[in-house]
């Protein structure tokens, strides 16, 4: 599933082609996604794009009459293509632009979303989200306060959008390794110093992944069709049985609630 770096990479890739251009019309080939494509999107006509923003894993296209909310789901990607390029099997939605380009949404598993809202504030998919991990609001003091009475393991807590948004399975595993914290540690057992380190590491890992265009494991592609290259820098995720790059101990993989967790027994305590 695309996580925050992949969504931010998509945002940065499509923004220069959309802002200042006008959506002439939308083409919806298959509106049966995780939620049905909003009827307002079918009827889009002559709508200039004012901005392309991101909140958590949602892309937000600001138009004069409202907002398009896009979620990439498990396997979705957005590409900027020439208008004349014919669609393929899993190309479900196009925004045809005034500059001769098309924003094309591809989603083999159809678990993404294209929604419409007049006002962002209060929309149900955005209403209960925690702070952005790259913002000043997410810091060691905040994390320590939120962990203090939490009797659950730190890794699933990091992946809870009510704590902080966009830290999915890959980046939770990588950040905990970089901070030397075992993923099964109780959140309440973390000291303030550990929380300060973990908050800094999460920011650093996410920023590095954004620099590398995100992580491509299977489906994700950048807006220009290229993969994300952070997969080449993964320290533990997807490396079961391979030697730790720090100490040489084989990486361990466990599964909790259908989620794979990767860690080093030696480096993470």
UniProtKB/Swiss-Prot annotation:
EC number(s) reported in the record: 3.2.2.23, 4.2.99.18
Amino acids binding DNA: 90, 109, 150
Protein keywords: DNA damage, DNA repair, DNA-binding, Glycosidase, Hydrolase, Lyase, Metal-binding, Multifunctional enzyme, Zinc, Zinc-finger
Source organism superkingdom: Bacteria
Cofactor(s) the protein needs: Zn(2+)
GO molecular function: 8-oxo-7,8-dihydroguanine DNA N-glycosylase activity; class I DNA-(apurinic or apyrimidinic site) endonuclease activity; damaged DNA binding; zinc ion binding
Zinc fingers (FPG-type), renumbered ranges: 235-269
Pfam families: Fapy_DNA_glyco, H2TH, zf-FPG_IleRS
Cofactor remark from the record: Binds 1 zinc ion per subunit.
Location of the active site: 2-3, 57, 259
UniProt-listed GO biological process terms: base-excision repair
Catalytic activity: Hydrolysis of DNA containing ring-opened 7-methylguanine residues, releasing 2,6-diamino-4-hydroxy-5-(N-methyl)formamidopyrimidine; 2'-deoxyribonucleotide-(2'-deoxyribose 5'-phosphate)-2'-deoxyribonucleotide-DNA = a 3'-end 2'-deoxyribonucleotide-(2,3-dehydro-2,3-deoxyribose 5'-phosphate)-DNA + a 5'-end 5'-phospho-2'-deoxyribonucleoside-DNA + H(+)
SMART domains: Fapy_DNA_glyco (SM00898), H2TH (SM01232)
Family, similarity comment: Belongs to the FPG family.
NCBIfam families per UniProt: fpg, PRK01103.1
Function: Involved in base excision repair of DNA damaged by oxidation or by mutagenic agents. Acts as a DNA glycosylase that recognizes and removes damaged bases. Has a preference for oxidized purines, such as 7,8-dihydro-8-oxoguanine (8-oxoG). Has AP (apurinic/apyrimidinic) lyase activity and introduces nicks in the DNA strand. Cleaves the DNA backbone by beta-delta elimination to generate a single-strand break at the site of the removed base with both 3'- and 5'-phosphates.
Oligomer status and interactors: Monomer.
Protein known as: Formamidopyrimidine-DNA glycosylase
Species this protein is from: Escherichia coli O1:K1 / APEC
């Amino acid at each position: 599933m695309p996580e925050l770096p992949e969504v931010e990479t998509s945002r940065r890739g499509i923004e220069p082609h959309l802002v200042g251009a006008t959506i002439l019309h939308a083409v919806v080939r298959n509106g049966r996604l995780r939620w049905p494509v909003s009827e307002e999107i079918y009827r889009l006509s002559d709508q200039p794009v004012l901005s392309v923003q991101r909140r958590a894993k949602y892309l937000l296209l600001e138009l004069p009459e409202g907002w398009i909310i896009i979620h990439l789901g498990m396997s979705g990607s957005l590409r900027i293509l020439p208008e004349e390029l014919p669609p393929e099997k899993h190309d479900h939605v196009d925004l045809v632009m005034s500059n001769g380009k098309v924003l094309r949404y591809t989603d083999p598993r159809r678990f993404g979303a294209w929604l419409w809202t007049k006002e962002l504030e209060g929309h149900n998919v955005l209403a209960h989200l925690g702070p952005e991990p790259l913002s000043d609001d997410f810091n060691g003091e905040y994390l320590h306060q939120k962990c203090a009475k939490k009797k659950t393991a730190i890794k699933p807590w990091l992946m809870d959008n009510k704590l902080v948004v966009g830290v999915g399975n890959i980046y939770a595993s990588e950040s905990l390794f970089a901070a030397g914290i075992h993923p099964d540690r109780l959140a309440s057992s973390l000291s303030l110093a550990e929380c300060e380190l973990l908050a800094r590491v999460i920011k650093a890992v996410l920023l590095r992944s954004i620099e590398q265009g995100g992580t491509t494991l299977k489906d994700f592609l950048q807006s220009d069709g290229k993969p994300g290259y952070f997969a080449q820098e993964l320290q533990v995720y997807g490396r079961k049985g391979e030697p730790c790059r720090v100490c040489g101990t084989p990486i361990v993989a466990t599964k909790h609630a259908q989620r794979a967790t990767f860690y080093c027994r030696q480096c993470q305590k």
